[in-house]
């Protein structure tokens, strides 16, 4: 029996502008299963990131349906979606003065009170995510003081700290050397 966590039904992806609709891919049917590592591989510019933005609800589909836990992704409230899906995209972070620890701790935001106070359990989850990604030595550095490869690990730690049933990573090994690519893939397989 399949345990599908995310399903697409006849999904068409692309862009709508004032002048035209550009379809990148159409009639996509896929099933992502809980507990499985799934990779999407393809040439640059063919729509992988567009697909990921669409299946996570960031970008509207041109046609079709995306189901997360058998519920339309468009029907999720933002907080509920953040408790079921975490993602790491390729966009740059907005300017801020956050430390690495604080950036990873943002992954706990869907579970904190209205002022964002971390419980002892939240702090432990953040520390575990930092340990799993081997970035403890960076925790007190400002995120703008670290390399792109280190920042990629920090963003993955944030997704792990979010503790969701589904994690979507767009180009997760970008900026990582071979050793850290292997380490990350081993971590993701757990």
Model-assigned labels for residue ranges:
Residues 41-43:
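The feature captures the beta-strand-to-loop junction immediately N-terminal to the Walker
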Residues 56:
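Helix-to-loop junction immediately C-terminal to a conserved catalytic motif
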Residues 64-72, 81, 141:
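Conserved ABC transporter NBD signature motif
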Residues 6, 23-27:
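Conserved structural motif at the start of ABC-family nucleotide-binding domains
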Residues 116-118, 142-146, 150:
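Conserved ABC ATPase signature
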Residues 105, 120-138:
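Conserved ABC ATPase "signature" region
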Residues 167-171, 176:
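Catalytic Walker B motif of ABC-type/P-loop ATPase nucleotide-binding domains
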């Amino acid at each position: 029996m399949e345990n599908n966590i995310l399903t697409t039904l006849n999904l068409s992806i692309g862009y709508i502008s004032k002048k035209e609709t550009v379809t990148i891919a159409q009639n996509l049917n896929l099933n992502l299963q809980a507990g499985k590592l799934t990779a999407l591989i393809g040439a640059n510019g063919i729509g992988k990131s567009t697909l990921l933005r669409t299946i996570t609800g960031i970008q509207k589909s041109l046609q079709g349906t995306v189901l997360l836990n058998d519920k339309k992704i468009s029907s999720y409230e933002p907080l509920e979606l953040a408790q079921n899906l975490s993602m790491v995209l390729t966009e740059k972070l907005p300017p801020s003065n956050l430390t690495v620890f604080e950036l990873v701790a943002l992954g706990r935001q869907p579970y904190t009170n209205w002022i964002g106070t971390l419980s002892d359990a939240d702090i432990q989850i953040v520390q575990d995510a930092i340990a799993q990604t081997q970035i403890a030595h960076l925790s007190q550095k400002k995120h703008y003081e670290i390399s792109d490869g280190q920042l990629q690990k920090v963003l993955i730690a944030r997704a792990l700290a979010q503790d969701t049933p589904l994690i979507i990573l767009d180009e997760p090994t970008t900026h990582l050397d071979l050793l850290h690519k292997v380490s990350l893939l081993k971590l993701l397989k757990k």
